[in-house]
UniProtKB/Swiss-Prot annotation:
InterPro entries to which the protein is assigned, alphabetical: L-Ru-5P_3-Epase, L-Ru-5P_3-Epase_Enterobacteria, Sugar_Epim/Isomerase, Xyl_isomerase-like_sf, Xyl_isomerase-like_TIM-brl
Entry protein name: L-ribulose-5-phosphate 3-epimerase UlaE
Pfam families referenced in this protein's UniProt entry, alphabetically: AP_endonuc_2
Keywords recorded for this protein, A-Z: Isomerase
Enzyme Commission identifier(s): 5.1.3.22
Induction of its expression: Induced by L-ascorbate. Repressed by UlaR.
Reaction equations catalysed: L-ribulose 5-phosphate = L-xylulose 5-phosphate
Protein backbone atom coordinates (compact mmCIF):
# COMPACT_ATOMS: atom_id res chain seq x y z
CA UNK A 1 0.00 0.00 0.00
CA UNK A 2 2.71 2.51 0.97
CA UNK A 3 4.57 1.83 -2.27
CA UNK A 4 1.51 2.50 -4.44
CA UNK A 5 1.48 5.73 -6.36
CA UNK A 6 -2.18 6.59 -5.75
CA UNK A 7 -4.29 5.20 -2.87
CA UNK A 8 -7.74 4.69 -4.41
CA UNK A 9 -10.87 3.92 -2.40
CA UNK A 10 -14.57 3.38 -2.89
CA UNK A 11 -17.54 4.76 -0.95
CA UNK A 12 -19.55 2.21 1.01
CA UNK A 13 -22.78 3.26 -0.73
CA UNK A 14 -21.34 2.24 -4.10
CA UNK A 15 -21.23 -1.40 -3.00
CA UNK A 16 -24.14 -3.76 -2.21
CA UNK A 17 -25.98 -2.77 0.96
CA UNK A 18 -25.69 -4.85 4.12
CA UNK A 19 -23.90 -5.01 7.43
CA UNK A 20 -21.30 -7.72 6.69
CA UNK A 21 -18.06 -5.80 6.46
CA UNK A 22 -15.99 -8.87 5.70
CA UNK A 23 -18.02 -9.41 2.50
CA UNK A 24 -17.84 -5.71 1.62
CA UNK A 25 -14.08 -5.53 2.06
CA UNK A 26 -13.52 -8.76 0.15
CA UNK A 27 -15.51 -7.33 -2.76
CA UNK A 28 -13.58 -4.06 -2.62
CA UNK A 29 -10.33 -6.02 -2.75
CA UNK A 30 -11.55 -8.04 -5.73
CA UNK A 31 -12.40 -4.78 -7.50
CA UNK A 32 -8.90 -3.46 -6.87
CA UNK A 33 -9.51 -0.84 -4.19
CA UNK A 34 -7.17 -0.02 -1.33
CA UNK A 35 -9.83 1.16 1.10
CA UNK A 36 -13.54 1.67 1.74
CA UNK A 37 -15.07 4.79 3.28
CA UNK A 38 -17.79 4.08 5.85
CA UNK A 39 -21.04 6.04 5.84
CA UNK A 40 -22.78 7.15 9.01
CA UNK A 41 -25.76 9.01 7.60
CA UNK A 42 -29.03 10.25 9.09
CA UNK A 43 -30.80 6.87 8.85
CA UNK A 44 -31.35 4.98 12.09
CA UNK A 45 -29.69 1.92 10.55
CA UNK A 46 -26.34 3.58 9.92
CA UNK A 47 -26.53 5.79 13.01
CA UNK A 48 -26.82 2.63 15.11
CA UNK A 49 -23.24 1.74 14.16
CA UNK A 50 -22.08 4.32 16.65
CA UNK A 51 -23.60 2.09 19.36
CA UNK A 52 -21.92 -1.11 18.18
CA UNK A 53 -20.75 -3.46 20.89
CA UNK A 54 -17.10 -4.24 21.53
CA UNK A 55 -17.56 -7.50 19.61
CA UNK A 56 -19.06 -5.75 16.57
CA UNK A 57 -16.20 -3.24 16.49
CA UNK A 58 -13.68 -6.05 16.79
CA UNK A 59 -15.35 -7.87 13.88
CA UNK A 60 -14.72 -4.83 11.67
CA UNK A 61 -11.09 -4.65 12.77
CA UNK A 62 -10.66 -8.37 12.08
CA UNK A 63 -12.20 -7.96 8.61
CA UNK A 64 -9.70 -5.20 7.87
CA UNK A 65 -6.80 -7.38 9.02
CA UNK A 66 -8.03 -10.43 7.09
CA UNK A 67 -8.59 -8.63 3.79
CA UNK A 68 -5.90 -5.98 3.94
CA UNK A 69 -8.50 -3.43 2.82
CA UNK A 70 -8.58 -0.47 5.18
CA UNK A 71 -11.46 1.63 6.48
CA UNK A 72 -9.51 4.83 7.17
CA UNK A 73 -12.34 7.34 6.84
CA UNK A 74 -15.96 7.92 7.76
CA UNK A 75 -18.43 10.13 5.90
CA UNK A 76 -20.48 11.56 8.78
CA UNK A 77 -23.57 13.06 7.15
CA UNK A 78 -25.87 12.40 10.13
CA UNK A 79 -25.62 16.08 11.01
CA UNK A 80 -28.15 16.87 8.30
CA UNK A 81 -30.75 15.53 10.72
CA UNK A 82 -29.04 16.68 13.91
CA UNK A 83 -27.17 19.85 12.89
CA UNK A 84 -24.60 21.54 15.10
CA UNK A 85 -26.15 24.89 14.20
CA UNK A 86 -29.69 23.99 15.25
CA UNK A 87 -31.53 26.56 17.35
CA UNK A 88 -33.27 23.66 19.11
CA UNK A 89 -30.99 22.89 22.04
CA UNK A 90 -32.09 19.25 22.21
CA UNK A 91 -31.34 18.65 18.51
CA UNK A 92 -27.98 20.39 18.78
CA UNK A 93 -27.11 18.31 21.86
CA UNK A 94 -27.89 15.17 19.86
CA UNK A 95 -25.59 16.43 17.12
CA UNK A 96 -22.74 16.88 19.58
CA UNK A 97 -23.39 13.44 21.07
CA UNK A 98 -23.25 11.91 17.58
CA UNK A 99 -19.91 13.64 17.10
CA UNK A 100 -18.61 12.30 20.40
CA UNK A 101 -19.72 8.77 19.53
CA UNK A 102 -18.26 9.01 16.01
CA UNK A 103 -14.89 10.11 17.37
CA UNK A 104 -14.92 7.29 19.94
CA UNK A 105 -15.90 4.80 17.22
CA UNK A 106 -13.10 6.05 14.97
CA UNK A 107 -10.60 5.73 17.80
CA UNK A 108 -11.73 2.16 18.51
CA UNK A 109 -11.60 0.79 14.94
CA UNK A 110 -8.70 2.77 13.50
CA UNK A 111 -10.56 5.35 11.40
CA UNK A 112 -8.24 8.32 10.98
CA UNK A 113 -10.44 10.88 9.24
CA UNK A 114 -14.08 11.85 9.82
CA UNK A 115 -15.46 13.86 6.93
CA UNK A 116 -17.86 16.52 8.18
CA UNK A 117 -20.88 17.90 6.37
CA UNK A 118 -20.64 21.69 6.16
CA UNK A 119 -24.24 22.50 7.07
CA UNK A 120 -25.07 24.84 9.93
CA UNK A 121 -28.63 23.58 9.41
CA UNK A 122 -30.08 21.59 6.52
CA UNK A 123 -33.85 21.27 6.88
CA UNK A 124 -34.33 24.63 8.62
CA UNK A 125 -33.73 28.26 7.68
CA UNK A 126 -30.15 29.42 8.30
CA UNK A 127 -29.34 32.72 10.00
CA UNK A 128 -26.56 34.38 11.99
CA UNK A 129 -27.46 32.41 15.11
CA UNK A 130 -27.32 29.02 13.34
CA UNK A 131 -23.92 29.93 11.95
CA UNK A 132 -22.66 30.99 15.38
CA UNK A 133 -23.88 27.75 16.93
CA UNK A 134 -22.26 25.81 14.10
CA UNK A 135 -18.90 27.51 14.70
CA UNK A 136 -19.12 26.84 18.42
CA UNK A 137 -20.10 23.22 17.74
CA UNK A 138 -17.10 22.76 15.48
CA UNK A 139 -14.83 24.18 18.16
CA UNK A 140 -16.16 21.74 20.74
CA UNK A 141 -15.92 18.88 18.24
CA UNK A 142 -12.32 19.62 17.36
CA UNK A 143 -11.41 19.69 21.04
CA UNK A 144 -12.83 16.15 21.38
CA UNK A 145 -11.07 15.02 18.21
CA UNK A 146 -7.75 16.41 19.43
CA UNK A 147 -7.88 14.31 22.57
CA UNK A 148 -8.63 11.20 20.48
CA UNK A 149 -6.05 11.99 17.76
CA UNK A 150 -8.75 11.74 15.09
CA UNK A 151 -8.82 14.25 12.22
CA UNK A 152 -12.05 16.08 11.41
CA UNK A 153 -12.06 17.17 7.75
CA UNK A 154 -14.61 19.51 6.22
CA UNK A 155 -16.22 18.54 2.92
CA UNK A 156 -16.84 21.13 0.22
CA UNK A 157 -20.59 20.99 -0.01
CA UNK A 158 -23.74 21.27 -2.10
CA UNK A 159 -24.66 24.16 0.23
CA UNK A 160 -23.60 27.85 0.07
CA UNK A 161 -22.08 28.00 3.56
CA UNK A 162 -19.27 25.62 2.57
CA UNK A 163 -19.19 25.54 -1.23
CA UNK A 164 -15.54 26.45 -1.72
CA UNK A 165 -12.15 25.62 -0.28
CA UNK A 166 -11.71 29.32 0.47
CA UNK A 167 -14.73 29.27 2.78
CA UNK A 168 -13.58 26.06 4.49
CA UNK A 169 -10.13 27.58 5.01
CA UNK A 170 -11.81 30.37 6.94
CA UNK A 171 -13.01 27.79 9.46
CA UNK A 172 -9.56 26.17 9.51
CA UNK A 173 -8.00 29.52 10.41
CA UNK A 174 -10.72 30.21 12.98
CA UNK A 175 -10.21 26.84 14.70
CA UNK A 176 -6.41 26.89 14.24
CA UNK A 177 -6.07 23.22 15.14
CA UNK A 178 -4.07 20.50 13.33
CA UNK A 179 -6.93 18.04 13.88
CA UNK A 180 -9.22 20.10 11.61
CA UNK A 181 -8.47 19.88 7.90
CA UNK A 182 -10.20 19.80 4.50
CA UNK A 183 -11.71 16.96 2.47
CA UNK A 184 -12.76 18.55 -0.84
CA UNK A 185 -15.19 17.00 -3.28
CA UNK A 186 -14.08 18.01 -6.78
CA UNK A 187 -17.63 17.45 -8.02
CA UNK A 188 -19.21 19.82 -5.53
CA UNK A 189 -16.38 22.31 -6.02
CA UNK A 190 -16.95 22.31 -9.79
CA UNK A 191 -20.74 22.68 -9.64
CA UNK A 192 -20.48 26.18 -8.18
CA UNK A 193 -18.98 29.32 -9.72
CA UNK A 194 -15.48 28.57 -8.43
CA UNK A 195 -12.04 28.90 -10.00
CA UNK A 196 -11.56 25.20 -9.33
CA UNK A 197 -7.82 24.97 -9.98
CA UNK A 198 -7.07 28.05 -7.86
CA UNK A 199 -9.24 26.65 -5.07
CA UNK A 200 -7.40 23.31 -5.11
CA UNK A 201 -4.05 25.08 -4.99
CA UNK A 202 -5.24 27.21 -2.06
CA UNK A 203 -6.12 24.09 -0.08
CA UNK A 204 -2.78 22.33 -0.43
CA UNK A 205 -1.31 21.68 2.99
CA UNK A 206 -4.79 21.20 4.43
CA UNK A 207 -6.27 18.57 2.08
CA UNK A 208 -6.26 15.09 3.68
CA UNK A 209 -8.36 13.27 1.04
CA UNK A 210 -10.33 13.98 -2.15
CA UNK A 211 -13.82 12.85 -3.18
CA UNK A 212 -14.13 12.07 -6.89
CA UNK A 213 -17.53 12.38 -8.59
CA UNK A 214 -19.16 14.22 -11.49
CA UNK A 215 -21.79 16.94 -11.10
CA UNK A 216 -23.81 19.55 -12.96
CA UNK A 217 -24.90 22.95 -11.65
CA UNK A 218 -27.62 22.16 -9.12
CA UNK A 219 -27.18 18.37 -9.51
CA UNK A 220 -24.78 16.95 -6.94
CA UNK A 221 -25.51 13.20 -6.98
CA UNK A 222 -25.81 10.35 -9.47
CA UNK A 223 -24.34 12.19 -12.46
CA UNK A 224 -22.59 9.51 -14.57
CA UNK A 225 -18.86 10.10 -14.98
CA UNK A 226 -18.22 12.08 -18.14
CA UNK A 227 -21.70 13.61 -18.32
CA UNK A 228 -21.11 16.51 -15.94
CA UNK A 229 -18.97 19.64 -15.75
CA UNK A 230 -15.94 18.38 -13.82
CA UNK A 231 -12.62 18.72 -15.64
CA UNK A 232 -11.10 15.65 -14.00
CA UNK A 233 -7.83 15.71 -15.90
CA UNK A 234 -7.07 19.31 -14.93
CA UNK A 235 -8.07 18.70 -11.31
CA UNK A 236 -5.80 15.67 -11.08
CA UNK A 237 -2.95 17.58 -12.76
CA UNK A 238 -3.35 20.52 -10.36
CA UNK A 239 -3.36 18.29 -7.30
CA UNK A 240 -0.32 16.36 -8.52
CA UNK A 241 1.66 19.47 -9.43
CA UNK A 242 0.77 21.07 -6.10
CA UNK A 243 2.31 18.13 -4.25
CA UNK A 244 -0.83 16.33 -3.06
CA UNK A 245 0.00 12.65 -2.48
CA UNK A 246 -3.00 11.53 -0.44
CA UNK A 247 -5.96 9.25 -1.15
CA UNK A 248 -8.75 9.61 -3.70
CA UNK A 249 -12.23 8.22 -3.03
CA UNK A 250 -14.71 7.43 -5.81
CA UNK A 251 -18.09 8.54 -4.47
CA UNK A 252 -21.10 6.70 -5.91
CA UNK A 253 -24.58 5.66 -4.76
CA UNK A 254 -24.96 2.40 -6.72
CA UNK A 255 -25.75 0.13 -3.74
CA UNK A 256 -29.31 -0.39 -5.01
CA UNK A 257 -28.33 -0.86 -8.67
CA UNK A 258 -29.03 -4.16 -10.41
CA UNK A 259 -25.29 -4.89 -10.50
CA UNK A 260 -23.41 -2.50 -8.19
CA UNK A 261 -20.04 -4.14 -8.84
CA UNK A 262 -20.37 -3.66 -12.60
CA UNK A 263 -21.26 0.01 -12.09
CA UNK A 264 -18.22 0.47 -9.86
CA UNK A 265 -15.85 -1.24 -12.31
CA UNK A 266 -17.08 0.99 -15.13
CA UNK A 267 -16.61 4.14 -13.04
CA UNK A 268 -13.22 3.05 -11.73
CA UNK A 269 -11.91 2.36 -15.23
CA UNK A 270 -13.14 5.78 -16.35
CA UNK A 271 -11.49 7.59 -13.42
CA UNK A 272 -8.21 5.70 -13.81
CA UNK A 273 -8.09 6.64 -17.49
CA UNK A 274 -8.31 10.34 -16.53
CA UNK A 275 -5.67 9.84 -13.86
CA UNK A 276 -3.41 8.26 -16.48
CA UNK A 277 -3.90 11.24 -18.80
CA UNK A 278 -2.93 13.50 -15.90
CA UNK A 279 0.26 11.49 -15.41
CA UNK A 280 -0.79 10.13 -12.03
CA UNK A 281 -0.96 6.43 -12.88
CA UNK A 282 0.20 4.25 -15.73
CA UNK A 283 -2.37 3.66 -18.45
CA UNK A 284 -3.98 0.23 -18.33
Amino acid sequence: MLSKQIPLGIYEKALPAGECWLERLRLAKTLGFDFVEMSVDETNERLSRLDWSREQRLALVNAIVETGVRVPSMCLSAHRRFPLGSEDDAVRAQGLEIMRKAIQFAQDVGIRVIQLAGYDVYYQEANNETRRRFRDGLKESVEMASRAQVTLAMEIMDYPLMNSISKALGYAHYLNNPWFQLYPDIGNLSAWDNDVQMELQAGIGHIVAVHVKDTKPGVFKNVPFGEGVVDFERCFETLKQSGYCGPYLIEMWSETAEDPAAEVVKACDWVKARMAKAGMVEAA
